[in-house]
Amino acid sequence: MELLKLNRSVQGTGPGPGASLCRPGAPLLNSSSVGNLSCEPPRIRGAGTRELELAIRITLYAVIFLMSVGGNMLIIVVLGLSRRLRTVTNAFLLSLAVSDLLLAVACMPFTLLPNLMGTFIFGTVICKAVSYLMGVSVSVSTLSLVAIALERYSAICRPLQARVWQTRSHAARVIVATWLLSGLLMVPYPVYTVVQPVGPRVLQCVHRWPSARVRQTWSVLLLLLLFFIPGVVMAVAYGLISRELYLGLRFDGDSDSDSQSRVRNQGGLPGAVHQNGRCRPETGAVGEDSDGCYVQLPRSRPALELTALTAPGPGSGSRPTQAKLLAKKRVVRMLLVIVVLFFLCWLPVYSANTWRAFDGPGAHRALSGAPISFIHLLSYASACVNPLVYCFMHRRFRQACLETCARCCPRPPRARPRALPDEDPPTPSIASLSRLSYTTISTLGPG
């Protein structure tokens, strides 16, 4: 993907991930992870207005940069240190965090500093390297989102087939292929990136394409490969996941109602119900971090349920179902947020790039100045919203984050308070109740 270049005075250049530098005093514009930083002489406005816009943009740059670097570094550290989080999905999240961190580190400083200094001082090698890394980081981020969508679709909607190939070694191969494919796709950027003078002691890092047709073809190719096709795949995958989860909601409600009716009419014990081979969530996967529903095979001698130790009261069998319903609703909401944020962050940039490739003057008149700058800032924001959506809404990640912080900053042990005389005695643990259940079944003998 590439960003809009609005400087019409440089012939033969086009949008791309490099940072094309501004003339001194021009308003702050920026490039996204794959676009040029472009500047245009400021419109006739008051000095106070220009200074206010510049201050707002610099502040937004700083906030997004700190959130992107801090959030993605935290993800990398927590996922790397926590053994419990070394799963297939988290392997893709780790790759996504690395690509987002690369996007923030390799793009934003080389966008902001040349705007403030008025010229590109880093040389041709840095210009080509930054251009290439910007493109690779955005490509890896997009492909990682697609891989996560397909992995979750397989885990939830095709659980039996997914268990065969969903291993960490397979995820590692997919991640390596994602980085290699992105690296090959972005080879044209360093090839056609140059540093050229645009005025006395003013340099720009720009892309000089062979022709306008090549620039248009490249813009359409990136629009299809890195936005339209991934967006469709993600929308379809998460749509099918949402459909499966909502069907599971209705199935759980119907099956629990039937189970409670049998308990009331027959005096029996509620058991695990499976109708028509439809998948239901794994036992114990009631939390918000459950990421799949798997078919449970019936046991020959099911153990006595813990609820059988007490008489079934009104609503006692509905609590697990309510917990599962709430967990599934949270998953559906998170999936919708993922798709909406993806389109929200990248649709304006891709639309502007395509518009610029086919109608440069019209795009220049409409988007030069503050509009294109904030469009690019919106694309930068994707690097800091991904950690929030994928990890900070994950209960186990929050727990692992707290454990990591406690490990790095240990606190002195506190004295345990003594129990007061009027406190309730400790309740028996689940393990002791389980032993009681097993002993009861053993004494009763096989049914």
From Swiss-Prot:
Keywords: Cell membrane, Disulfide bond, G-protein coupled receptor, Glycoprotein, Lipoprotein, Membrane, Palmitate, Receptor, Transducer, Transmembrane, Transmembrane helix. It comes from the Eukaryota. Disulfide bonds join C127-C205. Residues 1-57, 110-131, 190-219, 356-373 are extracellular. One of its GO terms (biological process) is cholecystokinin signaling pathway. Glycans are attached at N7, N30, N36. One of its GO terms (molecular function) is gastrin receptor activity. GO terms for cellular component: intracellular membrane-bounded organelle; plasma membrane. It is a multi-pass membrane protein. The keyword Protein transport does not apply. Coiled coil: none annotated. A lipid is attached at C408 (S-palmitoyl cysteine). The keyword Transcription does not apply. Residues 258-285 are annotated as: Disordered. Isoform 1 is expressed in brain, pancreas, stomach, the colon cancer cell line LoVo and the T-lymphoblastoma Jurkat, but not in heart, placenta, liver, lung, skeletal muscle, kidney or the stomach cancer cell line AGS. Expressed at high levels in the small cell lung cancer cell line NCI-H510, at lower levels in NCI-H345, NCI-H69 and GLC-28 cell lines, not expressed in GLC-19 cell line. Within the stomach, expressed at high levels in the mucosa of the gastric fundus and at low levels in the antrum and duodenum. Residues 80-87, 151-170, 243-333, 395-447 are cytoplasmic. The chain crosses the membrane at residues 58-79, 88-109, 132-150, 171-189, 220-242, 334-355, 374-394. It is found in: Cell membrane. PANTHER family: G-PROTEIN COUPLED RECEPTOR, GASTRIN_CHOLECYSTOKININ TYPE B RECEPTOR. Receptor for gastrin and cholecystokinin. The CCK-B receptors occur throughout the central nervous system where they modulate anxiety, analgesia, arousal, and neuroleptic activity. This receptor mediates its action by association with G proteins that activate a phosphatidylinositol-calcium second messenger system. Isoform 2 is constitutively activated and may regulate cancer cell proliferation via a gastrin-independent mechanism. Belongs to the G-protein coupled receptor 1 family. This is Gastrin/cholecystokinin type B receptor. It comes from Homo sapiens (Human). The gene is CCKBR.
